[in-house]
Amino acid sequence: MAAGKSARKVIMKERNTTLETTDHNNRNNSENIKETPDERIPGKLIGAIVAVGSLAFIGILTETVMTVLFPQLMREFNVNTATVQWITTIYLLTVAATMPLSSYLNRKFKHRVLFLAAVALAVLGSLTMIFGHAFPVILVARIIQGIGSGVATPLMMNIILEQSPRSKVGRLMGVGSLVITVAPAIGPTVGGAVSSILPWRAIFVIVIPVI
């Protein structure tokens, strides 16, 4: 009987300890839940995301803008359809080759350095598009732009993942994905509207101040 009472006391003590621990954990969880909605996205972070997102948006936009310019480019450079398509193909290949390096670049360089490099490449590529008067030069310009876009797009996602409050990551990733999906959708419309009233090089003249 004494042994049975002792066992019951031990069991009751363990239960009380478990209940106290559970209650303590629940209070901590409740406090954490209350704190989460109060997390704010720093203004500096918003500025960084807008800046890098705009750069990525322009890079993706110019990729689809070029498709509606093919007839003009074929006439100006005297090339056929198969050749003029390399303007888009070489850009996409360059972006695809650059993006896998984003993890390495992110470890080696600060976000600011990568952003400035992407801006410099975007401006250089656009200037080359404006002043290039030979088809090979245009292809080189697209390679330069592709490297810039290949750096900017993953950089936007890295900034969101590394610097955003945990409760806001999903929302900001959604905004980042929106940038990537909207840009190619409106590219042909923008390209057609601009090229209908201005020379095709005007697109890149407009892009440079935005960058």
Predicted region positions:
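Short, intrinsically disordered terminal tails adjacent to the first/last structured region
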Residues: M1-I33
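Transmembrane-helix bundle of Major Facilitator Superfamily
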Residues: E20-I211
